[in-house]
């Protein structure tokens, strides 16, 4: 996660903007605040035979394009969704003024409103945190988890001290899944890394999903209860973690027996990180290795 303010990227040529499609697809599905800014020639030159007049309006079908030919207030456009700004430039492209046009510019930081609030009443269960955190910070989710008093499974175990490591491994055993099957499961965000955890979720009698995206991007998501905000007032029953701790201990003993492998390598990397490190992890296999084979490290940023 880059944070809660918008991240922008630019393209100035007529072909380079097509390379933004993968990032925009990811931003759309993850509901990330992303701005694609493309430079364009004036609209009057379109379809006239002029060079560099590829029609860039609506080139990214999943997000809205704002075709801009003059100065406007951009703030109303930033609604918490990825957007495309297509900027028309007319000649002269370089001002004849010799003043430093950046002098005196002041950027006011945008405060993030987290969408935390509301009340949740439930009994016993298990909390499962998807790798994307549903857009919440780990601090916000850790606060919620401490109020809930349930066992915690996290697809990103490095950020959650109370999460039970190696859950994706031992939940792959159908007998273990059945033995640990809960009455309630709360899922924060999307669980997309592990089939075993998703099979475990299916065993719950009552499923609660917390994710702001159920309002629009994921409006067909199914659960007994869909919440668009992380509850701040939580009433629940303490759920024992003894069997979860024992399962993690047994799995840990087996993991330590691993000879050199990619799983051993990712553990070695995590062990060598210094305090407050930022760890960037590729998709597919590497992020799944972290989910299944590592445990909380308080030095991971």
Residue ranges, per PLM feature:
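Glycine-rich phosphate/diphosphate-binding loops that line cofactor/substrate pockets in enzymes
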Residues: 1-5, 75-79, 116-125, 144, ...
């Amino acid at each position: 996660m880059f944070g809660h303010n918008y991240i922008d990227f630019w393209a100035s040529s007529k072909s380079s903007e097509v390379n933004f499609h993968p990032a925009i697809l990811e931003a759309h599905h993850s509901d990330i605040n992303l701005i694609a800014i493309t430079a364009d020639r004036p609209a009057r030159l379109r379809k006239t035979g002029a060079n560099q007049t590829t029609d860039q309006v609506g080139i990214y079908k999943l997000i809205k394009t704002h075709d801009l030919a003059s100065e406007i207030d951009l703030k109303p456009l930033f609604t918490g969704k990825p957007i495309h700004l297509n900027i028309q430039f007319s000649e002269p492209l370089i001002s004849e003024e010799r003043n430093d046009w950046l002098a005196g510019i002041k950027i006011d930081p945008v405060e993030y409103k987290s969408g935390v609030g509301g009340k949740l009443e439930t009994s016993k269960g298990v909390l499962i945190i998807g790798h994307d955190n549903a857009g919440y910070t780990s601090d916000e989710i850790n606060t919620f988890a401490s109020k809930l008093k349930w066992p915690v499974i996290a697809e990103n175990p490095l950020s959650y001290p109370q999460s039970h490591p190696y859950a994706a491994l031992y939940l792959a055993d159908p007998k273990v899944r059945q033995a640990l099957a809960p009455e309630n499961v709360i899922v924060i965000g999307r669980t997309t890394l592990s089939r075993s955890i998703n099979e475990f979720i299916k065993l719950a009698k009552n499923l609660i999903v917390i994710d702001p995206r159920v309002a629009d991007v994921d409006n067909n998501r199914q659960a007994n209860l869909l919440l668009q905000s992380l509850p701040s007032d939580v009433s629940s029953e303490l759920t024992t973690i003894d069997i979860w701790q024992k399962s993690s201990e047994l799995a840990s003993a087996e993991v330590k027996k691993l000879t050199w492998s990619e799983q051993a390598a990712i553990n070695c990397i995590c062990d060598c990180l210094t305090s407050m490190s930022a760890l960037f992890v590729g998709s597919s296999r590497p992020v799944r290795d972290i989910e299944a084979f590592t445990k909380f490290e308080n030095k991971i940023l």
